C-alpha cells in the first residue's frame, strides 16, 4: 500500500513524541548535571552577558575533579539550549553561551532560585521511588505510600533521623518561597487586613513567615513544626518558632497559614487538620489561609502539566494529592467552614481562604 507523504510526516511526529518520552529522564539528568558542574553560575559570575565555550570549560569543575572535555561540554550545552536553559551564539568563529530567562531561576545565592528544589527532587532517595510508580498506582489510600515501603519510613520520619535529608527538604521549601514571595505578598494584602497574629502551620524554617512580617510589620508571626525542624531553623526577626505536632495542637491566632501542607495528605487527615485550624482562629473574623495548587483538568497549558507532575510526585512519595476547585470545595465543607474563596496569583499555587 502506498504511504502518502502526509501520513509519513504525521507518523514521524508520533515517533518523535515517543522517543522524547522514552528519553525523558535525559532532561532531569542534564539539569542536575548542569547544576553539579556549576554551568549557570559560571556564566553569571563571569560578569559578562556571554562567554565562549572555551572560557566555560576552563571555569566549570567536575564533581570527580576530572578536567572537562570541551567536545562533551558542547554536547551538554547544546541539549540545554533545546531545554531553553542556555542560549548558544557565535563570536569570532567560536561558540558562545549565555543565560536565558528560565536559567536565571537556577542560580545560587540569588533572591529567586529553584536550585534547591532541583537538588531535592533529583536526589537518590527520591529518584529510586519512581521505579515503583506502578506499585503506587495500585496502593490503596489507607496504606503507606511507596516512599515508606522503599525506605522503611516516611519522609518526615527520615528527616527526624538524618539532618542532611531534613536540610534538603526545608531548603527546597525555602527555595519555593523565594520564587512565590512577590505573588504571595501581593495576594495577601487584603486578606491580612485586620490580622494582628498569624501562625504558619508546618512552616518549616520560617522563610514564608519572615517575608510576611517584613511586608506587614503589624503582624505577630509564629511557625509551628516538628521539633527536629524547629531545632535546625535559623533565627528570623519577628518570627517565633513553636515545637509541636500540628495534628494535636495549634496555638490561637487571628489567622492560620497552610503553605504546601494539605497536598501531603489524603482527605481524612486534611479534614482533621483543618478542624484544628478552625478551632485556633476566632469564629467571627478568623481565617485559614491555604497556599496550594488548584488543578484545572480542562487546561492543557505548561503550568497545568507542571501541576500534574507534582500531583504524581506527592502520590508516589508522600501519599497525598493535588486538588481541583471541586476537591477544595468538598474538603473545606467537610471541615465545617461556612464559605471559602480561591484567589489565583502569579505563581504555581493559588491562595484559598476558608472562613469559619
UniProtKB/Swiss-Prot annotation:
The keyword Ribosomal protein does not apply. GO terms for biological process: alkaloid metabolic process; methylation. S-adenosyl-L-methionine binds at residues 173, 177, 202, 225, 245-246, 259. Coiled coil: none annotated. GO terms for molecular function: (S)-scoulerine 9-O-methyltransferase activity; O-methyltransferase activity; protein dimerization activity. The active site is at residue 263. SUPFAM superfamilies: S-adenosyl-L-methionine-dependent methyltransferases, Winged helix' DNA-binding domain. It is an enzyme of class 2 (transferase). Keywords: Alkaloid metabolism, Methyltransferase, S-adenosyl-L-methionine, Transferase. Signal peptide: none annotated. The keyword RNA-binding does not apply. Its EC number is 2.1.1.117. PROSITE patterns: SAM_OMT_II (PS51683). It holds the Pfam family Methyltransf_2. Pathway: Alkaloid biosynthesis. Substrate binds at residues 176, 260-264. Gene3D superfamilies: Vaccinia Virus protein VP39 (3.40.50.150), Winged helix-like DNA-binding domain superfamily/Winged helix DNA-binding domain (1.10.10.10). It catalyses: (S)-scoulerine + S-adenosyl-L-methionine = (S)-tetrahydrocolumbamine + S-adenosyl-L-homocysteine + H(+). Methyltransferase involved in the biosynthesis of the benzylisoquinoline alkaloid noscapine. Catalyzes the conversion of (S)-scoulerine to (S)-tetrahydrocolumbamine. The heterodimers OMT2B-SOMT3 and OMT2B-6OMT do not possess 3-O-acetyl-4'-O-demethylpapaveroxine 4'-O-methyltransferase activity. PANTHER family: O-METHYLTRANSFERASE. Belongs to the class I-like SAM-binding methyltransferase superfamily. Cation-independent O-methyltransferase family. COMT subfamily. This is Probable scoulerine-9-O-methyltransferase OMT2B. It comes from Papaver somniferum. The lineage of its organism: Eukaryota, Viridiplantae, Streptophyta, Embryophyta, Tracheophyta.
Amino acid at each position: 500500500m502506498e504511504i502518502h507523504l502526509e501520513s509519513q510526516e504525521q507518523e514521524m511526529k508520533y515517533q518523535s513524541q515517543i522517543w522524547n518520552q522514552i528519553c525523558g529522564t535525559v532532561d532531569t539528568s542534564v539539569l542536575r548535571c548542569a547544576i553539579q558542574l556549576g554551568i549557570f553560575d559560571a556564566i553569571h559570575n563571569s560578569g559578562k552577558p556571554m562567554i565562549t565555550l572555551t572560557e566555560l570549560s576552563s571555569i566549570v569543575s567536575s564533581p570527580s575533579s576530572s578536567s572537562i572535555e570541551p567536545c562533551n561540554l558542547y554536547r551538554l550545552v547544546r541539549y540545554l539550549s533545546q531545554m531553553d536553559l542556555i542560549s548558544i551564539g557565535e563570536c569570532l568563529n567560536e561558540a558562545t553561551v549565555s543565560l536565558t530567562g528560565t536559567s536565571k531561576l537556577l542560580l545560587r545565592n540569588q533572591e529567586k532560585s529553584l536550585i534547591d528544589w532541583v537538588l531535592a527532587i533529583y536526589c537518590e532517595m527520591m529518584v529510586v521511588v519512581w521505579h515503583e510508580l506502578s506499585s503506587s498506582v495500585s496502593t490503596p489510600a489507607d496504606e503507606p505510600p511507596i516512599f515508606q515501603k522503599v525506605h522503611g519510613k516516611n519522609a518526615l520520619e527520615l528527616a527526624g533521623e538524618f539532618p542532611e535529608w531534613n536540610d534538603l527538604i526545608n531548603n527546597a521549601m525555602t527555595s519555593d518561597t523565594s520564587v512565590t514571595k512577590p505573588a504571595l505578598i501581593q495576594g495577601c494584602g487584603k486578606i491580612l487586613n485586620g490580622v494582628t497574629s498569624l501562625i504558619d502551620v508546618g512552616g518549616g524554617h520560617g522563610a514564608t513567615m519572615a517575608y510576611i512580617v517584613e511586608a506587614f510589620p503589624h503582624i505577630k508571626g509564629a511557625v509551628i513544626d516538628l521539633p527536629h525542624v524547629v531545632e535546625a531553623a535559623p533565627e528570623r526577626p519577628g518570627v517565633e518558632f513553636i515545637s509541636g505536632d500540628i495534628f494535636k495542637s495549634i496555638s490561637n491566632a487571628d489567622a492560620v497559614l497552610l503553605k504546601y501542607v494539605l497536598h501531603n495528605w489524603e482527605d481524612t487527615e486534611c479534614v482533621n487538620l483543618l478542624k484544628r485550624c478552625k478551632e485556633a482562629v476566632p469564629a467571627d473574623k478568623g481565617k485559614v489561609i491555604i497556599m496550594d495548587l488548584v488543578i484545572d483538568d480542562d487546561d492543557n497549558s505548561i503550568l497545568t502539566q507542571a501541576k500534574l507532575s507534582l500531583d504524581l510526585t506527592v502520590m508516589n512519595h508522600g501519599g497525598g494529592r493535588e486538588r481541583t476547585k471541586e476537591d477544595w470545595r468538598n474538603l473545606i465543607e467537610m471541615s465545617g467552614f461556612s464559605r471559602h474563596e480561591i484567589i489565583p496569583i502569579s505563581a504555581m499555587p493559588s491562595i484559598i481562604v476558608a472562613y469559619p
